[in-house]
UniProtKB/Swiss-Prot annotation:
The keyword DNA repair applies. Keywords: DNA damage, DNA repair. GO terms for biological process: mismatch repair. InterPro entries: DNA_mismatch_repair_CS, DNA_mismatch_repair_MutL, DNA_mismatch_S5_2-like, HATPase_C_sf, MutL/Mlh/PMS, MutL/Mlh/Pms-like, MutL_C, MutL_C_dimsub. It comes from the Bacteria. One of its GO terms (molecular function) is ATP binding. Gene3D superfamilies: 3.30.230.10, Histidine kinase-like ATPase, C-terminal domain, MutL, C-terminal domain, dimerisation subdomain, MutL, C-terminal domain, regulatory subdomain. Belongs to the DNA mismatch repair MutL/HexB family. CDD domains: HATPase_MutL-MLH-PMS-like, MutL_Trans. This is DNA mismatch repair protein MutL. GO terms for cellular component: mismatch repair complex. Signal peptide: none annotated. This protein is involved in the repair of mismatches in DNA. It is required for dam-dependent methyl-directed DNA mismatch repair. May act as a 'molecular matchmaker', a protein that promotes the formation of a stable complex between two or more DNA-binding proteins in an ATP-dependent manner without itself being part of a final effector complex.
Length: 595
């Protein structure tokens, strides 16, 4: 077979295959061009989800007839000089989009330069240009793309339904709109207005907040912490959800690098790490986060669609993002989601008061800010005989409830819920969830500070497991478990002998503890990094620590728990994302008794 040069039209169609995957790709490229052109208003019109027609109009700087002639050629751009290749500030720079789109569609471009007398128009069919003509148009540019992929009909087979393709276009417009709150966006599909966003001309935080409300909704804002974090060459701003407001997928995580929407595994992992103490593995935070970084420290020329980036120092970026998120969350560490129970019971406070933790070290790098001073007014009492009857009203404590964020305990219901009174509300605490969170904080604190003390068993316990595999797994990890204050040895083929356990677990069921550890670790603990194994083991410890919570509590024990919640960050949710408390405002309760 003879080697030959490809024709210009074939080259453009190949390039289109890399850049233009679907109608949403066209929308993205044209809208980004409009933004680079200095637009303050962008209109998008679609027919059949963009398969039949895509129109993007803007009020940007426009083009002259000579610029229009050059713009539709491959590798032509006004946005990049050779010296700027590693200092890119614009969305477009490759000079491929218009030529690639024109190669697979019927394109009509009409443009008028600002303060020019005339507008000009050029038509392209399958990449073949026609003569530029004089036209009538307002300042700015309008690009019409008809019959997408008509020149490459095989690509049409890979398009999804109109509903799916339309959703992709809406998604990309929303992402771009989030990054540009000063620009107005209008999206129309089949004569129906689907998105109308008015540009704001206020300070950056107000602009961003209003745009997020317009695009995502105010529920997210009410359940989010504001991020404002700066270093000499890096800044992060945006909103990230409090731990109790989460979802089962990561689709509502909007990440931007220099206002460019991206999907980056490094940043997604950083999000997971920032929330690892508060969210289960199958739950995801919601966020709109903007990272501004020196363009010379990030390479956006990794993917033809510019959806991926490469950082000069990825570990630094990762650590900075984790610290920024943790700092933001610390400021709202005792807020529970406003949506909890709101659909089930209108009495649940929709705007809970922010309870800032007292005696808290708010450094984001620490595991927890729990205060373990021994001379506090209330301390954790030993688990012994409980004389207080369940549900029995507790005499008013000498301390006024006005002094405490969670008030003073008044009663316990069904050995599960604590009822406390504050100055203007009733707080209902799920004691099991609260103890679970408390246990997590204690264990993490003790691990970090080397205070996870071993307790030697008076009589070592022999635990027989269901298989040799499980026994071998535990024995192979005995050194790692020893660092977690659990001392074990092999005792026969399927048995383990336990001589020491963590003191914090108290009078724990050793048989059940070891069985649970074996069940959880046998499938994937081999060669597991110590840090990851620690997370697994801690969660098992917590379960056994909090088992003791479902019992009768004395007045002192209940108030002790409330005080410890006040002194603990992120006390609003347990480790399974359930709220530890809900608050009923007195004014809401009074509504029930009105005629």
């Amino acid at each position: 077979m003879t080697i030959k040069f490809l024709s210009e039209s074939t080259i453009n169609r190949i390039a289109a295959g890399e850049v233009i995957e679907r109608p949403a790709s066209v929308v993205k490229e044209l809208v980004e061009n409009a933004i680079d052109g200095g637009s303050t208003k962008i209109d998008i019109i679609l027919e059949r989800a963009g398969k039949n027609l895509i129109i993007v109009s803007d009020d940007g700087i426009g083009m002259t007839d000579k610029e229009l002639e050059i713009a539709v050629k491959r590798h032509t751009t006004s946005k990049l000089n050779e010296s700027d290749f590693f200092n890119i500030h614009t969305f477009g720079f490759r000079g491929e989009a218009l030529a690639s789109i024109a190669a697979i569609s019927k394109m009509l471009i009409t443009s008028k330069k600002r303060e020019a007398d005339k507008a000009f128009q050029i038509k392209l069919i399958g990449g073949n240009k026609q003569q530029i003509t004089v036209s009538v148009h307002n300042e700015g540019t309008k690009i019409e793309v008809r019959d997408l992929f008509f020149a490459t009909p095989a690509r049409l087979k890979f398009l999804r339904s109109d509903k799916t393709e339309l959703a992709a276009s809406i998604d990309i417009v929303k992402k771009i709109a989030l990054a540009h709150p000063r620009i107005s966006f209008n999206l129309i599909h089949d004569n129906k207005n689907l998105l109308k966003l008015k540009g704001q001309n206020k300070d950056s935080e107000t602009n961003l907040k209003q745009r997020i409300i317009d695009v995502i909704g105010d529920v997210f804002i009410k359940n989010a912490a504001y991020i404002d974090f700066k270093t000499p060459d890096f800044s992060i701003c945006g909103y990230t959800s409090i731990p109790t407001y989460n979802k089962a997928s990561s689709e509502d995580q909007f990440l931007f690098i220099n206002n460019r929407p991206i999907k980056d595994k490094l940043l997604q992992v950083a999000l997971r790490v920032a929330y690892q103490d508060y969210l289960a593995r199958d739950r995801y935070a919601l966020c709109v986060i903007f990272l501004q970084i020196d363009p010379q420290l990030v390479d956006v020329n990794v993917h033809p669609a510019k959806a991926e980036v490469r950082f000069h120092d990825p570990n630094y970026v990762r650590n900075i993002l984790i610290e920024a998120i943790k700092n933001a969350l610390t400021n709202k560490s005792q807020i529970t989601a406003t949506t909890i129970g709101s659909d089930k019971n209108s009495l649940v406070n929709k705007e809970p008061t922010i309870h800032k933790a007292t005696n808290v070290n708010s450094k984001a790098s620490e595991y927890t800010s729990f205060n373990f001073k021994r001379n506090t007014a209330y301390h954790t009492l030993p688990y012994g005989k409980i004389e207080q009857e369940v549900g029995k009203c507790i005499e008013h404590n000498n301390q006024s409830h006005k002094q405490y964020k969670f008030g003073v305990a008044k009663a316990q219901l069904h050995t599960t819920y604590i009822i406390s009174q504050t100055e203007d509300s009733i707080v209902i605490i799920d004691q099991h969830a609260a103890y679970e969170r408390l246990g997590y904080a204690k264990i993490k604190y003790c691990l970090k500070n080397g205070e996870l003390v071993k307790q030697r068993l008076l009589i070592p316990e022999i635990v027989e497991l269901s298989s040799q595999k499980k026994a071998d797994c535990l024995y192979e990890n005995r050194e790692k478990l020893f660092k977690l204050s659990l001392t074990i040895e092999k005792f026969g083929e399927k048995s383990i002998i336990v001589t020491e356990i963590p003191n914090i677990l108290g009078d724990v069921n050793v048989q059940k503890l070891i069985q649970d550890l074996a069940d959880h670790l046998s499938d994937f603990a081999k060669n597991m990094p110590l840090k990851e194994l620690i997370e697994h083991v801690i969660k098992i410890y917590i379960c056994h620590y909090s088992i003791r919570a479902a019992r009768k509590l004395s007045a002192d024990e209940m108030n002790s728990l409330l005080r410890q919640m006040e002194n603990m960050s992120f006390s609003a949710q347990c480790n399974n994302n359930r709220p530890t408390y809900i608050e009923l405002k007195l004014k809401d309760i009074e509504l029930l008794f009105r005629l």
